[in-house]
Amino acid sequence: MSTTAYPDTILIIDFGSQVTQLIARRVREANVYCEIVPFQSADEAFKRLQPKGVILSGSPHSTTDIGSPRAPQAIFDAGIPVLGICYGEQTMCAQLGGNVESGHDREFGRAFLDVQEDSPLFAGIWAKGTRHQVWMSHGDRVTSLPDGFTIIGTSPNAPYAVIADEKRKYYGVQFHPEVVHTPDGAKLLQNFVHRIVGVKPGWTMGAYREQAVEAIRKQVGSGKVICALSGGVDSSVAALLAHEAVGDQLTCILVDHGLMRKDEVQQVVEMFREHYNLPLILVDASDRFIGALEGESDPEKKRKTIGRLFIEVFEEEARKLGGADFLVQGTLYPDVIESVSFTGGPSVTIKSHHNVGGLPERMKMQLVEPLRELFKDEVRLLGKELGLPDSFIGRHPFPGPGLAIRCPGGVTREKLEILREADAIYLDEIRKAGLYDAIWQAFAVLLPVQTVGVMGDGRTYEFVCALRAVTSVDGMTADFYHYDMNFLGNAATRIINEVRGINRVVYDVTSKPPGTIEWE
């Protein structure tokens, strides 16, 4: 029997591709549960999850290099469908007796694929003899096939662009179906999980709610639970799930660390105490947090300090309650992914998430993380399932470390107050322009830079404020929002006129990658 809560699971083995997370998004959009695991732990994960099918990701590695990553032999011995994408196709061929070579013509970017044969992979999408746009990114290519495989699609520089062993249900594609630049890619992945693997589209937020509630009850038993409530969508959905699961065993704790947006603490208290009747304790720890952060400019130290203080405060409040056994957090799947290295060797961490890397090892409570398998848009769907209003579900993401990581350089009360006012004006302008729901995340950043200005007849020397706005689906990739210049001019004018301490406003036009959404 499978040890996962989801018997119909697709396992995605990550060989280090930058877009592996997009494979998971496409599979989830097909209402099928999947998990990403790094190739180093794929053997253990395969035994634990007992998946119905496996997808092998792309990779920056070359299959021809000595010691390059390989898929566990167990997946080929299990008699289940396997789809190899780019490097995944190449390692599957190499492991099953085919041949892969380097040094041939490379393909990067848009390419056109000619369908040579009909296949369940193409059913209802592509027909034999047709040509379709795909997105390629490869230097190596397959030069001979293992026994049982046939060519079902070709491109000018990839004669083995799509291959299939229909009997064993092994498929390989040299292109990337998970990216939007392959227009039919999502449908091809749906065909793999629905038609070929045979998994029905049963992964819904209604089903997840039932399973999550049951999992919380099983983990917690009769123990006391406290929930880290911030008022953001993630912690709020986690709190409502926990309350549905264990009722009066739960006490929510809202820590006012002095790093929240304008009026946010009061709004959260009113909503959860009065509307949802959740037991809520408000802890004013702003002096403690800001004192610990004062003068600290290293962003990693900021995050870890905030994570450590969060846990200290929760433990103290738990003792006041007579002890607590469990701590609920709104950790999401991207938090987990970004805090783990999938590329082998020493871990390369993008940045510590205060929910993950910032936690001290000797925490005295066990973590309950009911959302750690979900992407952000799935959390919003779950919030809707739980009855949260659309106006709340649609709120922009706000980081746990709060304004501290939107204030590069040393943190002071004065700088936080300046930033808080500028941010409130910016968001007000966005709402008045009717743009709030079109933007994934928008916020102000107070830079550790002062510039000369002129106000009235006097010279000023004040801070620079950067405005940030991005569009995204799940936070894994993002593009900057393309405002009308009149909007930016109006927002900048209001901020400079109404916020004492700022005399210059700039707009951030960096996408993710290469940047991250937050500045720190």
Swiss-Prot record:
EC number from the UniProt entry: 6.3.5.2
Binding site for ATP: S230, G231, G232, V233, D234, S235, S236
Record-annotated Glutamine amidotransferase type-1 domain positions: 9-202
Name of the gene encoding the protein in the UniProt record: guaA
Source species: Brucella melitensis biotype 2 (strain ATCC 23457)
UniProt KW keywords: ATP-binding, Glutamine amidotransferase, GMP biosynthesis, Ligase, Nucleotide-binding, Purine biosynthesis
Protein's name in the database: GMP synthase [glutamine-hydrolyzing]
UniProt superkingdom: Bacteria
Catalytic reaction(s) noted: XMP + L-glutamine + ATP + H2O = GMP + L-glutamate + AMP + diphosphate + 2 H(+)
A GO CC annotation given for this chain: cytosol
Pathway of action: Purine metabolism; GMP biosynthesis; GMP from XMP (L-Gln route): step 1/1
SUBUNIT field: Homodimer.
GO molecular function, one term: ATP binding
Known role: Catalyzes the synthesis of GMP from XMP.
